[in-house]
Amino acid sequence: YNVVKKGIPWPLGDFENKRSFTSIDNLCYVVEGLLTKDVASGIYHMGDDEALSTNELIALMCEAMGKEPHIWKMNRKMMEGCAGLGTLLHLPLNTERLRKLTENYVVSNEKIKLALGIDRMPVRAADGIMKTIRSF
């Protein structure tokens, strides 16, 4: 959030990843459904229907703040090399941090939707992100 707010360019635009998010509205909808419907106990993953890339997230955050996104598509191999050097020199951008920033983390919400008898969550991921950023 602060990187985008300060207008700092995102240099990892060459990496395409997908991440699951959960809007507060969808979370409240699911909690209400669990309280009011006869849902079997179990482990359910919670998430919006659409996974977003970090590049999409930054673009949405910028849109919500009325800013232009600054997404730089620095060469992937060069960034991996810089991160490797960062690991050796104990710098903030290292191999582990680069992996965490660029890896996929997508969960399926199919089980909870099936349990609640719905086809889609009420709020799209992009709309949830926009609402959240505008609330700050």
Identify the role of each PLM range:
Residues 1-20, 69-106:
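Alpha-helical membrane-targeting segments
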Residues 4, 34-35, 116, 136:
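Hydrophobic residues in alpha-helical segments
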Residues 12-35, 41-42, 127:
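Substrate-positioning beta->alpha
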Residues 15-18, 45, 49, 100, ...:
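Conserved short-loop catalytic and cofactor-binding motifs
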Residues 19-25, 52, 107, 120-123:
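Residue-level signal for the nucleotide or nucleotide-sugar donor/cofactor binding architecture
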Residues 34-93, 109, 129-133:
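Mid/C-terminal beta-alpha module of Rossmann-like enzyme folds, strongest
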Residues 62, 117-118:
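A short, basic/aromatic helix-end/turn motif that makes direct DNA contacts
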Residues 111-113, 119, 123-136:
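Amphipathic terminal alpha-helices
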